[in-house]
Amino acid sequence: AQRVDELENVNIRTTTCPFPPKTVLADPERKHFIYNDYHMSAASRKLHDKDLCNYVPLTYHEGPSFYERDYVAADVALIKVAPMDKHGFFNLGTALSLTPLFCDTAKTVIVEVNENVPICLGGCRESIHISEVDYIVEGDNQPMIQLPELPIADTDKKIAAIVLEEIEDGACLQLGIGAMPNAVGAMIAQSDLKDLGVHTEMLVDSFVDMYEAGRITGRRKQLDKCKMAYTFAMGTNKLYNFLDGNPACAIY
């Protein structure tokens, strides 16, 4: 964003960005940056209504083929990572998902080191080796994104109560973003349910509450037994501190 007047026709691709990118704010007439989002957040939808964001229609499972078939070859993959460990690996942090594929297919791989990125242990390629990196940026250690806690309305509570009745001991959970999933998580944490498992796209703060209340053990899971499997996490420092080096969680 600081180099806005030096650059032209720069395509930026991201997904579920919770806040307007600085590149968009620095270029409100889209003369320099073209912002694209695969899975539009509330912030991206508002930008789209102002013609400041392109929506890329892509269902999640299509992501690998989208890149492997070179439909959208990237020149640069810029990834935020944790500091390098003694073996030369940078942990990719809270958003694994398609990140290894971005690195595999980009012409240039740049990592920005941030000491606040938690070490997220996983099941497959949760780290990138220094030999696979072209450039390293020593950043200013920006804080992790904090998702504000949304107020839970009476309607959310009523829906959550209905959902809770359908959950049995040993059930496997997936929760998304918003007040209603948080309400479900809060009620589960206060319930007497046992041995729940987690296999979710997104990990949020309410999973921490359920785990610490003893509701989540994963003992009855057949896949990733005794682990909470997820592909990205977004919440507050309570969640990020919980994830840091935690073998009870597995990111994919």
Show where each model-derived region lies.
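Conserved alpha/beta enzyme-core scaffold
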Residues: A1-Y252
